[in-house]
């Protein structure tokens, strides 16, 4: 760096001497042109010039790279309905619906077999030898005959299905005082005593019997009922039996 500055000062000194020589020569006489001096040091760069006029539009560049995925736009309007698809498989069976309204009354049926429908009769034994409470239904649980199944051995009650005149009878073995009621009605609250049969004896076997004819309506119930005198037996050799049968059906029913 010092060498470069030394050369610069040398050149400046020579230029100065040349200038003085020329000035002196001109002042004395005009001589021939001197030798061109050494080029000066480059000056400081000038300020930027004014913007030039816009250039001609260049050709279209290559497509840029794909940008990032943008956010979802707003929901569009419904499209045009498509064509119907194929019929799908059959679904499972749905729940059972509510019962519909009753249909119209059907036509009158053919006449039935009078003989078959009017045969009503039953006989049943009591084989249970257990004490009875007052007002308890006396159950004759072993069926001998039960035409048309109007007698129910599980509760000892006869239910009328064919209105008409019926005959009911019982034969009861006992050892002591015995009174039984024969009752009728449609339900527990409407049961009424029709007749009471009694027999009195002490420490001896006896058989008590009784019977009655009743006009029954459909769904009326008939059964025997115990009282406070209830020495009824139901053992082998001392049976008790309850019987009933239809005498004449009610033709107007």
UniProtKB/Swiss-Prot annotation:
Residues annotated to bind Ca(2+): 199-200, 206
Keywords assigned by UniProt, alphabetized: Calcium, Collagen, Complement pathway, Disulfide bond, Glycoprotein, Hydroxylation, Immunity, Innate immunity, Metal-binding, Pyrrolidone carboxylic acid, Repeat, Secreted, Signal
Domain C1q, first and last residues per copy: 115-253
Modified residues (Pyrrolidone carboxylic acid): 26
One GO MF term attached to the UniProt entry: identical protein binding
Domain of life: Eukaryota
Region spans: Disordered: 35-115
UniProt note on regulation of activity: The C1Q subcomplex is inhibited by sulfated molecules, such as triterpenoid sulfates, heparan sulfate, or chondroitin sulfates.
Modification type 5-hydroxylysine: residues: 57, 60, 75, 90, 96, 108
Claim: Lipid biosynthesis is one of the keywords in the record: no
Post-translational modification: Hydroxylated on lysine and proline residues. Hydroxylated lysine residues can be glycosylated. Mouse C1Q contains up to 64.0 hydroxylysine-galactosylglucose residues. Total percentage hydroxylysine residues glycosylated is 95.1%. Contains no hydroxylysine-monosaccharides.
Gene Ontology process terms (BP): complement activation, classical pathway; innate immune response; inner ear development; synapse pruning
Recorded GO CC terms: collagen trimer; complement component C1 complex; complement component C1q complex; extracellular region; extracellular space; extrinsic component of postsynaptic membrane; extrinsic component of presynaptic membrane; glutamatergic synapse
Tissue distribution of the protein: Highest expression in thioglycolate-activated peritoneal macrophages. Also found in spleen, thymus and heart. Very weak expression liver, kidney, lung and intestine.
Residue pairs linked by disulfide bridges in the UniProt entry: 179-198
UniProt free text on domains: The C1q domain is the ligand-recognition domain, which specifically recognizes and binds the Fc regions of IgG or IgM immunoglobulins.
Role played: Core component of the complement C1 complex, a multiprotein complex that initiates the classical pathway of the complement system, a cascade of proteins that leads to phagocytosis and breakdown of pathogens and signaling that strengthens the adaptive immune system.
Subunit structure: Core component of the complement C1 complex, a calcium-dependent complex composed of 1 molecule of the C1Q subcomplex, 2 molecules of C1R and 2 molecules of C1S. The C1Q subcomplex is composed 18 subunits: 3 chains of C1QA, C1QB, and C1QC trimerize to form 6 collagen-like triple helices connected to six globular ligand-recognition modules (C1q domain).
Annotated protein name in UniProt: Complement C1q subcomponent subunit B
The gene coding this protein: C1qb
